[in-house]
């Protein structure tokens, strides 16, 4: 783990999800897309700019690499931080979609499933409606273009049937 950190601001529920899954400070897996994105945008620190940290910012460890040693390359510009935040938000959306896409199978309401998902992923339940609406917008945007990703057939565990 690197002792160099970068601070990026996120929506509160994404910050909670990050800290729950990757610790505080956040340390991504070695070969992850997030680390690749961070490494891609790392540059030398321009001049003697001090690192500023906002109240809601999440501390993320900068991955070390042979091509860009963290001692020299430890700065992300404002736009680079936005790009890394987009990459992390995509990972969040992927997990939300994968975990809730087949919710029709369990015969419960979407809101109760989202609340359970929040609890399982370290997110305050106060964001349940926000995440429910996010999920519904994702699903509806596909449906609008004629792509129905909901399961239509019954999944059977028993292979004899």
Regions found by a protein language model. Name each.
Residues 1-80:
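Long, low-complexity interaction regions most often at the N-terminus
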Residues 64, 134, 158-160:
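Intrinsically disordered, low-complexity linear regions
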Residues 84-105:
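Positively charged, polyanion-binding regions of nucleic-acid-associated proteins
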Residues 89, 107-111, 124-129:
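Alpha-helix N-cap/helix-initiation sites
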Residues 101-121:
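Short, charged amphipathic recognition helices of the HTH superfamily
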Residues 116-132:
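Short, basic interhelical loop/turn and adjoining N-cap
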Residues 134-149:
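Short, basic alpha-helical nucleic acid-contact segments in DNA-binding proteins
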Residues 148-161:
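Intrinsically disordered, low-complexity basic tails/linkers immediately adjacent to helix-turn-helix/homeobox/MYB/SANT
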């Amino acid at each position: 783990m690197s002792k160099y950190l970068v601070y990026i601001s996120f929506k509160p529920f994404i910050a909670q999800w990050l800290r729950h899954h990757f610790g505080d400070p956040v340390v991504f897996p070695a070969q992850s897309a997030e680390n690749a994105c961070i490494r891609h945008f790392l540059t030398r620190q321009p001049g003697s700019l001090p690192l500023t940290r906002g109240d809601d910012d999440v501390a993320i460890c900068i991955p070390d690499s042979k091509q860009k040693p963290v001692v020299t390359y430890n700065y992300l510009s404002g736009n680079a931080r936005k790009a890394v935040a987009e990459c992390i938000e995509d990972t969040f959306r992927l997990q939300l979609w994968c975990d809730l896409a087949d919710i029709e199978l369990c015969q419960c309401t979407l809101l109760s499933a989202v609340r359970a998902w929040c609890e399982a992923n370290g997110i305050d339940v106060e964001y349940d409606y926000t995440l429910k609406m996010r999920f519904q917008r994702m699903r509806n945007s596909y449906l609008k273009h004629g792509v129905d990703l909901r399961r239509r057939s019954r999944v059977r565990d028993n292979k004899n049937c």
